[in-house]
Amino acid sequence: MGARGAPSRRRQAGRRPRYLPTGSFPFLLLLLLLCIQLGGGQKKKENLLAEKVEQLMEWSSRRSVFRMNGDKFRKFIKAPPRNYSMIVMFTALQPQRQCSVCRLANEEYQILANSWRYSSAFCNKLFFSKVDYDEGTDIFQQLNINSAPTFMHFPPKGRPKRADTFDLQRIGFGAEQLAKWIADRTDVHIRVFRPPNYSGTIALALLVSLVGGLLYLRRNNLEFIYNKTGWAMVSLCIVFAMTSGQMWNHIRGPPYAHKNPHNGQVSYIHGSSQVQFVAESHIILVLNAAITMGMDLLNEAATSKGDVGKRRIICLVGLGLVVFFFSFLLSIFRSKYHGYPYSFLIK
């Protein structure tokens, strides 16, 4: 037994320990350094992201919509890392630009941002900012933005897609429309809260006071209340005001017209079906009144018993008013509802 175990012990004693090849040490050292560098780089990215989010939260605590210049835009929006969405309004608010639509859009944008800032769902995943043309001309050129205002969504990862640019001409720039678009792009739902407006209540109180005072002064002679012509005129004025969009103007407060800052051309009719100017309401009111007058003349020519020649002239005048102004009204409708196939005389 002892003789058998002796050769085995001699063979075990004769074995030499195995060592790694000499050329593998640099490889292991390089792999170790690479792991350390990757870990350090990841930590650096996390620290940079935390600093960016902290800075954005600080700006948001001061203002719901913070301004950005070229350097801030490149650092907080274009450069990674990012884990937040950014809504940016590209605008031109300087007085020399004479962009009335920009001011109105800015008010709606501010209402939306305030609604998000003071909501219970507010978090560091969505921020609102704006870039003025006079403070970031290079950004406008880089993104090929030729008109203002323009709303864009910059996602946490990747580049903005076509749907990340808000279709202002088709949808309008109301806070509710912007909130719906943001919900589609970011899955963040914002409930819009508008500040109370007491101008309507004050105007109604003044109107009631005026009517009450008039009735009190004429309390001994109230025959004018039964005047059919007077009530008919009042009814027509109310109908013309409501059908021309005066109530929409009262709620939204649009500008009277829009002057293009590039060529100075003034637009009295907005190209979108969701937005209108005050001048547009006045134009529609006049057109409706002219069509009504034409219909009244046609009715007068058909029912009166006067001279036939005079009735024929009244009929032709009434028909001309209806045909021309209805054609004009239909052309305005076509210009706002793109793709509407029908027209009459005027295209």
Curated annotation (Swiss-Prot):
InterPro entries: OligosaccharylTrfase_OST3/OST6, Thioredoxin-like_sf. Residues 42-196, 243-276, 334-347 are lumenal. GO terms for molecular function: oligosaccharyltransferase complex binding. Residues 59-187 form the Thioredoxin domain. The keyword DNA-binding does not apply. Its main location: endoplasmic reticulum. The chain crosses the membrane at residues 197-217, 222-242, 277-297, 313-333. It is a multi-pass membrane protein. GO terms for biological process: cognition; magnesium ion transport; protein N-linked glycosylation via asparagine. Keywords: Disulfide bond, Endoplasmic reticulum, Glycoprotein, Magnesium, Membrane, Signal, Transmembrane, Transmembrane helix, Transport. Acts as accessory component of the N-oligosaccharyl transferase (OST) complex which catalyzes the transfer of a high mannose oligosaccharide from a lipid-linked oligosaccharide donor to an asparagine residue within an Asn-X-Ser/Thr consensus motif in nascent polypeptide chains. Involved in N-glycosylation of STT3B-dependent substrates. Specifically required for the glycosylation of a subset of acceptor sites that are near cysteine residues; in this function seems to act redundantly with MAGT1. Belongs to the OST3/OST6 family. Accessory component of the STT3B-containing form of the oligosaccharyltransferase (OST) complex. OST exists in two different complex forms which contain common core subunits RPN1, RPN2, OST48, OST4, DAD1 and TMEM258, either STT3A or STT3B as catalytic subunits, and form-specific accessory subunits. OST can form stable complexes with the Sec61 complex or with both the Sec61 and TRAP complexes. The association of TUSC3 or MAGT1 with the STT3B-containing complex seems to be mutually exclusvice. This is Dolichyl-diphosphooligosaccharide--protein glycosyltransferase subunit TUSC3. It comes from Bos taurus (Bovine).
